[in-house]
A protein has these predicted regions:
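Aromatic-Pro/Gly-enriched surface loop or interdomain linker
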Residues: 1-75, 118-122, 230, 243-247
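An acidic, glycine-rich "communication" segment
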Residues: 1-2, 9-18, 33, 111-200
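Extracellular ligand-binding/catalytic regions of CAZymes and related secreted enzymes
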Residues: 2-7, 111, 191, 201-203, ...
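Short alpha-beta junction capping motif
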Residues: 4-6, 11, 65-124, 210-219
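Short, flexible/disordered intra-domain loops and linkers
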Residues: 15-28, 81-94, 123-129, 231-234
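Sec-exported extracytoplasmic/periplasmic mature domains
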Residues: 41, 106-107, 117, 140, ...
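Alpha-helical scaffolding within the catalytic cores
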Residues: 57-63, 100, 201-205
Length: 253
C-alpha cells in the first residue's frame, strides 16, 4: 500500500443569527476533502487525513516522522500553521523548521503535491504565504506575490496538453468544469499536463516536476467544492485522476 498524508482541508466558521430583537451564535466545523477520501477508499492508497487544526502539532517535526509516508498532500492550509505551532506562538520556544524539513524529505525521494484553495500557494489576500519558502523551492511552480485567486464563475473546461502522459491515462474526452484556480508560474523544467483555456488566462492546472530524487506536483484548483463543480466530483475520471497522480508521485527517481 502507498501511504499518503493529506494535510489541511478543514476549517471552523462562526455565525451570528438575528431574529428580530434576539440573536444567537453558532460554530460549525467543515471538511473539504470528502470527495477525495471517498475516491481513494478501497484503493491501493492508504490515506491519512490530518485536519488543518491538527497539523500545527501533529505534522512531523523530524525526518523519521516524514519517512512514514510516500506522498504528502498540502491542500488549503497556509504556511503559518507549520511555522507557528503553539510552542513558538505561545511559549517562544525554538522548533525544527518543517518547511525546510519537507523540502529535504522531497529531495531524498518523497512525493509532494500541493492542491489549490484559498489557503494554498499564495492564497486569498496573499495570506497562505507559500511564496519564497523552502516548500515553494520543491514545487514545480512558483507562487505570485499577490492574491492569486482566479475566480471563474462561468466555469472553465481544462485543456489537456499531454494526453500521452501516464497521469492522463483513461481521462479522455472533455473534463467537467472547474470554477477557479490559484495563479502560478510553471518552472522551465516542469511539465504542464493541463491548463485553463487561453481565453480564460491559460493558467496552469496540473504541473509535474522533480526536486532532487523526489517527484512533485501542483494541482491549482480545489480537490472538492467550491472550485470543483459537483459534476467534476461525480465524474468517473475524478478518482482515476487522483490515483494516477498519486501513483506517479510515489514512484521514486
Amino acid at each position: 500500500m502507498t501511504k499518503v498524508l493529506l494535510v489541511g482541508e478543514s476549517w471552523v466558521s462562526s455565525a451570528t443569527h438575528y431574529k428580530g430583537f434576539d440573536q444567537f451564535g453558532s460554530v460549525t466545523f467543515h471538511l473539504g476533502a470528502e470527495p477525495l477520501v471517498a475516491a481513494l477508499k478501497g484503493s491501493d492508497f492508504d490515506l491519512t487525513y490530518m485536519k488543518a487544526h491538527e497539523a500545527a502539532e501533529s505534522f512531523p517535526f523530524d525526518m523519521d516522522g516524514l519517512d512514514a509516508w510516500d506522498v504528502v498532500i498540502l491542500s488549503d492550509i497556509g504556511s503559518n500553521t507549520f511555522l507557528l505551532p503553539p510552542a513558538v506562538w505561545l511559549r517562544s520556544e525554538t522548533v525544527p523548521n518543517r518547511l525546510r524539513l519537507l523540502k529535504a524529505w522531497v529531495g531524498k525521494g518523497g512525493g509532494l503535491l500541493m492542491c489549490g484553495g484559498y489557503f494554498s500557494f499564495q492564497g486569498i489576500d496573499g495570506r497562505a504565504r507559500w511564496r519564497r519558502t523552502p516548500v515553494e523551492d520543491a514545487l514545480p511552480v512558483t507562487c505570485q506575490p499577490w492574491d492569486d485567486r482566479v475566480e471563474m464563475c462561468e466555469g472553465a473546461v481544462a485543456e489537456v496538453l499531454r494526453a500521452d502522459h501516464p497521469v492522463m491515462a483513461g481521462l479522455g474526452g472533455a473534463w467537467p468544469p472547474i470554477l477557479g484556480v490559484n495563479e502560478v508560474e510553471a518552472r522551465e523544467d516542469a511539465e504542464v499536463l493541463a491548463r485553463v483555456p487561453e481565453a480564460q488566462g491559460g493558467h496552469p492546472l496540473l504541473v509535474l516536476g522533480r526536486h532532487g530524487q523526489g517527484r512533485t506536483a501542483a494541482w491549482t484548483s480545489d480537490i472538492g467544492p467550491h472550485w470543483l463543480s459537483p459534476a467534476f466530483c461525480a465524474w468517473e475520471g475524478y478518482g482515476r485522476l487522483w490515483r494516477n497522480l498519486l501513483g506517479w508521485l510515489a514512484a521514486r527517481g
